[in-house]
Amino acid sequence: MRHYEIVLMIHTDQSDQISNIIEHYTKMIKINKGSIHRLEDWGRRQLAYPIKKLNKAHYILMNIETSTKVLNNIIQDLNLNNFIIRNMIMRVKNAINEPSPMKKTKENKELNN
């Protein structure tokens, strides 16, 4: 099995469905004996430029370990899902477990307030 990092940009109208979307992809991975090493909900963020006439999106980060077959199923599902504005999937050498820089800055801001 290989390690991948997935970033999803989800339409802001579906912010209340984020947990269902995460659960859907988590099930796809775990049913096929994959594992999730890191899962972060970055929340709503401003886009650098409008995409499909939207200025904000809800961001999700996942670091997973799964087979190529399951990854292809995930890619196909992402492309058919109208709520996913953009996605980025990168292959990484090792599992990443530590918090991302985005998560660290968000936690630091919460501690300072």
Swiss-Prot record:
One of its GO terms (cellular component) is cytosolic small ribosomal subunit. SUPFAM superfamilies: Ribosomal protein S6. Keywords: Ribonucleoprotein, Ribosomal protein, RNA-binding, rRNA-binding. It comes from the Bacteria. One of its GO terms (biological process) is translation. The keyword Ribosomal protein applies. PROSITE patterns: RIBOSOMAL_S6. NCBIfam families: S6. Binds together with bS18 to 16S ribosomal RNA. Belongs to the bacterial ribosomal protein bS6 family. This is Small ribosomal subunit protein bS6. The gene is rpsF.
